[in-house]
């Protein structure tokens, strides 16, 4: 799955640091926010019916604004337009490859 005409895209996420009072350790945690699927991702991820909240390039800075209004946050978390995305099947052996293998995302033959 990819965003057309954007070699890299961003997903909305949250990050927090908190103190574990038992150990005194500062725990750094994050989560990728999901939203309802669009028609493309619903077809692919058809068991949980969710997709990551993808941000357009023009919305990336807005997402990072700590004073962003709730209505604007809700707008940013809507499903990404399916016409701006595409997908293809990759080879089944991708699980056996290392993450830095340049062929890991090659289209299935």
PLM regions and their residue ranges:
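A structured binding-face within diverse protein domains that lines the active/interaction site
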Residues: 1-109
């Amino acid at each position: 799955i990819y965003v057309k005409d954007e070699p890299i895209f961003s997903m909305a996420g949250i990050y927090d640091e908190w103190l574990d009072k038992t150990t005194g350790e500062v725990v750094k945690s994050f989560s990728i926010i999901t939203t309802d699927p669009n028609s493309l991702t619903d077809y692919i991820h058809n068991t949980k019916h969710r997709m990551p909240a993808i941000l357009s390039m023009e919305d990336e800075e807005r997402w990072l604004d700590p004073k962003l209004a709730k209505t604007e946050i809700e707008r940013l978390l809507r499903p990404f337009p399916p016409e701006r995305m595409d997908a293809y099947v990759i080879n089944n052996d991708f699980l056996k490859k290392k993450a830095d293998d340049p062929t890991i995302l090659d289209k299935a033959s």
